[in-house]
């Protein structure tokens, strides 16, 4: 809800009208979650399951249960592993839609980070205390989206850092949503990491279809309708 308000500024008079925007708790939590701007308004209500052109009732049921029964997922320490080989198949969009849905009714700390970004933050944290603090918030978040796991280069220090993160979350039953172009069985990570991911996640395989391409086309056509007179 937005109301118009005017402010009387000393030695100036009344300023122009501005919108007094009431920010909901859910909106506030989203802005602090590090979810990319393009996905801040993503929701399950707007997620286009129909674009896949095939039966996705199982995937849809799992996704809906994650929001509706999140407390049970949390108690069991279970997250999701959202997988599809196809780029643009909606993995990140679905993960953010789920997180936004949970934040609408639960006061929990949610964080989003891609694995490449996480590794870059880790390197900087050796010299930067602020980066170290941010990493700790990511590590301990009640719900973490770890985007694009499996895309990282195979190096010992990377395995070490990922194990520390995954092991902490596994041991403390912190809910994690992983997204990946690589199936769990094919992850080229330390076996201890993969074992923990298997234990802490429900598999949610999306169809091999780029819905991003379809949505981009629809958005472009809608935009052109408004600018071509």
Regions found by a protein language model. Give the residues of each.
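Conserved alpha-helical scaffold flanking the Walker A/P-loop in AAA+ ATPase domains
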Residues: 65-71, 121-144, 160-168
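Walker A/P-loop nucleotide-binding motif
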Residues: 72-95
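A short, well-structured juxtamembrane/interface segment
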Residues: 55-78
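PRPP/pyrophosphate-binding module of the type I phosphoribosyltransferase fold
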Residues: 147
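Short glycine-rich substrate-engagement loop in P-loop NTPases that contacts/grips substrate
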Residues: 54-61, 85-89, 99-140
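A short, basic N-terminal segment
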Residues: 1-58, 65, 204, 208-229
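Loop/turn-to-beta-strand initiation segments
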Residues: 108-109, 140-143, 172-178
């Amino acid at each position: 809800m937005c109301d118009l308000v005017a402010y009387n500024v000393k030695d100036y008079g009344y300023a122009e009208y501005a919108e007094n925007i009431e920010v909901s708790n859910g909106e506030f939590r989203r802005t602090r979650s590090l979810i990319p701007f393009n996905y801040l308004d993503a929701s399950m209500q707007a997620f286009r399951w129909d674009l896949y052109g095939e039966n996705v009732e199982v995937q849809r049921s799992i996704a809906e249960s994650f929001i509706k029964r999140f407390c049970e997922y949390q108690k069991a320490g279970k997250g999701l592993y959202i997988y599809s080989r196809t780029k643009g198949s909606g993995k990140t969009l679905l993960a953010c839609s789920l997180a936004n849905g949970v934040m609408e009714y639960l006061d929990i700390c949610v964080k989003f980070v891609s694995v490449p970004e996480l590794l870059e933050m880790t390197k900087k944290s050796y010299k930067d205390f602020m980066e170290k603090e941010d990493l700790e918030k990511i590590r301990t978040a009640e719900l973490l989206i770890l985007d694009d796991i499996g895309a990282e280069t195979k190096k010992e220090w990377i395995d070490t850092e990922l194990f520390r993160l995954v092991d902490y979350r596994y041991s403390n039953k912190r809910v994690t949503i992983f997204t990946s172009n690589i199936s769990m069985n094919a992850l080229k990570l330390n076996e201890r990491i993969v074992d923990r991911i298997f234990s802490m996640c429900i598999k949610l395989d999306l169809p091999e279809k780029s819905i991003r391409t379809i949505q981009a086309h629809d958005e472009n056509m809608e935009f052109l309708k408004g600018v071509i007179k």
